[in-house]
Amino acid sequence: MAVQLDARPPVRPAHRTTRPSRGARLSRFDATYSPYLYVAPFFLVFGVFGIYPLVYTFWVSLHDWDLLGAEHPFVGLDNYSQLLADPDFWHSVVNTLGIFVISTVPQLLAALWLANLLNRQLRARTTWRMAVLIPNVTSTAAVAIVFAVLFGRDFGMINWLLDHVGISAIDWKANRFAAWVAISTMVDWRWTGYNALIFLAAMQAIPRDLYESAAIDGAGRARQFWSITVPLLKPTIIFAVIISTIGGLQLFTEPRMFNSGTNAIRGGPLRESQTVTMYMFENAFAPHYNFGYGSAIAWLLFALIALVAAVNVLLLRRLGGARKGDPR
């Protein structure tokens, strides 16, 4: 039998690469770029109403920008150097920080306690949870008018109560620290319930198994609160602190409405409760109309808010300790 030694295996024909169809290319393009198109409107709106005003305000702060004048000469950093040497500006900074500390610390502590109370098995829980939000949806002007009457010097209810315990009447608008306390009380009344609902929403996400295990081990409610609830609420507490910092350092309506009269924007005759935003309004608009100087105040306020918020976050992380998995 003859054997063919030079036989070779059959060669397969070369595989022809086919171009993806038009539909496949469109599908790949959609999967790759459509998420960016979906979020593009947000960044567009943020750029128009967020980034552009911020940049434009900085540009204006470099000019002697009189709102009633036609020319706006470039002055560089003169507005900032003048502002840093302005005693009225630093007076308003101290007022802002004082009101912020007096209002924010009790506010967040009360909100945390209130949220823990609302997280229990109460009758008509939905009604109570809705009720704590009523002060926040009330008109700020109406709240300010009511509190201005409560803290009135001659016929206010607070002085009437103080008189019954042997304390002489306090002029809440003429005394600097007293004005801080009055305005802080107004701010706390409006925003404690709002922060309580934020904490409550975070508490609802904590697994109930942790509390049941702690109860089996003999931990009481107080121990469960400090050992389970507070550590797991750390990201939410940081969020609430940042939001409260932004709002507290931009305080305007409450002190403005509390100090009604001819010196309202000045926070009283001796600027007892004038905040940075009120001082910015006084310079940028009536009576000075110096928009460049007011823009410089706005930028320094922005820097102050960023600094205080960063310090708050660092302190909370340092006091609470860094746990694995915490957002940074």
Regions found by a protein language model. Name each.
Residues T18-S21, M278:
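Short, charged N-terminal extramembrane segments
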Residues M1-R19, R328:
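Short, intrinsically disordered terminal tails adjacent to the first/last structured region
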Residues R22-S27, A31:
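Cytosolic juxtamembrane amphipathic/interface segments immediately preceding
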Residues Q4-A7, V11, R25, G166, ...:
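Acidic/proline-rich low-complexity IDRs
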